[in-house]
């Protein structure tokens, strides 16, 4: 058992009982989502966070990155690379990218719940996986050149 256990019932309470997110699901831009789908996403992500992402927390904390000043290169522990790969291979990066770039349209509150699990299990992975978030900002607020760069960032 790793250091992190996601409290999915607490997240469910906050999303649906406290914030009433169910009222916006099934409508407008969230027409393809319902409570069961959102909870399925959260449950699947819980498994990823508690296992694949949390697995590299200790290595990332104790060993960290190594910077070689002579070459300008940075080396990550292999376990961090493996955790990051699991996150990207599961296509969870899509939750932070705009729909126009292949992102998943979900309520911000659901994105925050997923981010909470990443941050709790391994904050370093959250930082390494912020590229799509930056692409989102560049795509939504940037010039035509910025939008082109944003597309490259998620490819």
Report the location of each language-model feature.
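Contiguous, well-ordered alpha-helical segments that form the cores/surfaces of helical PPI scaffolds
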Residues: 112-116, 132-140
């Amino acid at each position: 058992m790793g250091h992190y256990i996601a409290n999915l019932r607490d997240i469910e309470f906050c999303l649906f009982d406290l914030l009433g997110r169910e009222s916006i699901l099934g409508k407008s831009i969230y027409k393809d989502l319902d409570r069961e789908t959102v909870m399925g996403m959260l449950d699947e992500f819980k498994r990823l966070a508690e296992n694949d992402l949390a697995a590299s927390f200790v290595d990332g904390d104790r060993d960290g990155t190594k910077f070689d000043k002579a070459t300008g290169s940075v080396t990550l522990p292999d376990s961090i690379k493996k955790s990051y790969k699991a996150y990207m291979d599961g296509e969870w990066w899509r939750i932070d990218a705009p729909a126009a770039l292949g992102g998943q349209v979900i309520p911000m509150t659901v994105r925050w719940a997923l981010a909470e699990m990443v941050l709790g299990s391994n904050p370093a992975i959250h930082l390494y996986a912020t590229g799509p978030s930056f692409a989102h900002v560049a795509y939504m607020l940037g010039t035509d050149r910025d939008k082109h760069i944003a597309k490259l960032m998620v490819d």
